A protein has these predicted regions:
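Structural detector for helix-capping/boundary residues
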Residues: 48, 144-146, 151, 186, ...
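Conserved active-site beta-strand element of glycosyltransferases/polysaccharide synthases
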Residues: 232-234
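Short, polar/charged, Gly/Pro-enriched helix-capping and turn/loop motifs at alpha-helix termini
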Residues: 78, 127-131, 218, 222
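Short, Lys/Arg-enriched segments at the junction into DNA-binding effector domains
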Residues: 6-7, 119-181
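Positively charged, aromatic-enriched patches within helix-turn-helix-type DNA-binding elements
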Residues: 105, 154-219, 224-229
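N-terminal/domain-start alpha-helical segments
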Residues: 1-128
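A structure-centric signal for secondary-structure junctions around beta-strands
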Residues: 5, 77, 90, 137-138, ...
Length: 235
């Protein structure tokens, strides 16, 4: 992983939490910029370059979901880690559907959060700096009937192109390379989220569900669930 200093946008309306996050990122050797509401976050993201966004959901002016959507309109690759006291499955799924890469439920420990930030940096570096490690072709490959474009982060069926998040693309590439193999949930989590990932396998299941929707595999004919083990790409 690249060790250069990163720049993190921290979007949090609670002053105490925002200052704690700013201090943690600065102490970790990176630059940090704070935003107190959704509108300020969108404005700052539009004029400055960031390597990661820590994004609270319950924000004044514009909520975190709308901020995530606006950021993804400008940049499909920057890692977005959502922060929220709303820990229900539907809240997490909505965040992932909008393009978030991770979801941390409050209250959280700063060590756990930094571990997730480090993992997000590593995944981004592997995708951006080492494209030769994972591609099926230079830029595109087929997954079933969907054409996957690695540069544009899209899955296209016919004339309809659907955007992919970085993790969704990594999952598709991994399934494609391991076609026919039964891949355990632990293997997939380690390969895509990193060995220090502290979440649950439910996050993986949610991502696979989103991937299935985007490649029109809701009947699980391409990505088969192997109960008690993981998944298998049989396309």
């Amino acid at each position: 992983m690249s060790t250069h200093q990163r720049k993190v946008l921290i979007v949090e309306d609670d002053p105490a939490i925002r200052e704690a996050l700013l201090e943690a990122i600065l102490s970790d050797g990176h630059a940090a910029v704070g935003a107190v509401d959704g509108a300020e976050a969108v404005r700052k993201f539009g004029v400055e370059a960031f390597d990661l966004v820590l994004l609270d959901i319950m924000l004044p002016v514009m909520n975190g979901y709308d901020v995530c959507r606006r950021i993804r309109e400008k940049d499909r690759r920057v890692p977005i880690v959502m922060l929220s006291a709303k820990g229900s499955e539907i809240d997490k799924v909505l965040g992932l559907e909008l393009g978030a890469d991770d979801y941390v439920t409050k209250p959280f420990g700063l060590r756990e959060l930094l571990a997730r930030v480090h993992a997000a940096f590593r995944r981004h570096d592997l995708l951006a700096e080492a494209p030769g490690a994972a591609p099926v072709t230079a830029d595109t490959f087929y997954f079933g009937a969907a054409l996957i474009d690695r540069r544009r982060f899209t899955a296209t069926r016919g004339d309809v192109a659907t955007e992919l998040t970085a993790r969704e693309l990594q999952l598709l590439e991994l399934f494609h390379r391991k076609r026919g193999e039964v891949l355990s949930r632990d293997f997939l989590l380690n390969a895509v989220w990193g060995i220090d990932y502290m979440g649950t396998t439910r996050t993986l299941d949610q991502h696979v569900a989103q991937v299935r929707k985007k490649i029109d595999d809701t009947a699980a004919k391409l990505i088969k669930t192997v109960h008690g083990v993981g998944y298998q790409y049989i396309g």
